[in-house]
Amino acid sequence: MQDLAFHLLAFLFVAAFIAGFIDSIAGGGGMITIPAMLIAGIPPLQTLGTNKLQGLFGSGSATLSYARRGHVNLKEQLPMALMSAAGAVLGALLATIVPGDVLKAILPFLLIAIALYFGLKPNMGDVDQHSRVTPFVFTLTLVPLIGFYDGVFGPGTGSFFMLGFVTLAGFGVLKATAHTKFLNFGSNVGAFGVFLFFGAVLWKVGLLMGLGQFLGAQVGSRYAMAKGAKIIKPLLVIVSIALAIRLLADPTHPLRIWLGH
């Protein structure tokens, strides 16, 4: 399976670079990499496992880039990242038990709601606002819950973390983006460990795409730090709506099946 033709490997590398760029700013890289791997003929389970491997490079690259500029303190936020990883482990392990159809059915509408929130809310910039919950409560509740979701299903995880950081933690948009990437790295580590245990990782493909992700995330995170909320907000809105449309357009989407289309 890993002996893919050169043009397919080149295609996956480019897809990973673009995904790394977009994901480092607004999340949603999986909506590029997962279809790309399926198009290349990689089976669904190996696609999910390999996606987590290459995603580690993108989220890790963006996290380091943001941390070097002081937008996230890795030591201080490590407990939060560990809770995200723990949630993702449970999510990946329980993926067969959780009603996946319900998640798939409601996710597009949640993403549209997030897009509307970020698109219509005025005065949302890079300045921190008053927090609605303590960091302790945020770490013990929302973080593992979103990490769990990432392990079970995945698409839109970055949008949910962004929403939590902005609305509950009171973070500015750029700071929220930086912290989102670190927690996304944590959930990627957790879910990747489970897929690795079950042997669902294609190393050659994952490492090649990981290089593309790393480079794309370096470019994307630098662009985000240069432009701040001016680029992060609109890209987050676009990515959320695009992901919602892609999910609804899928013939296997539960809503389309229930409606008989």
UniProtKB/Swiss-Prot annotation:
It is found in: Cell membrane. The keyword Transport applies. The chain crosses the membrane at residues 8-28, 29-49, 78-98, 100-120, 133-151, 152-171, 189-209, 231-251. GO terms for cellular component: plasma membrane. Keywords: Cell membrane, Membrane, Transmembrane, Transmembrane helix, Transport. InterPro entries: TM_pro_TauE-like (IPR002781), TSUP (IPR052017). It comes from the Bacteria. Pfam families: TauE. It is a multi-pass membrane protein. Belongs to the 4-toluene sulfonate uptake permease (TSUP) (TC 2.A.102) family. This is Probable membrane transporter protein ORF9.
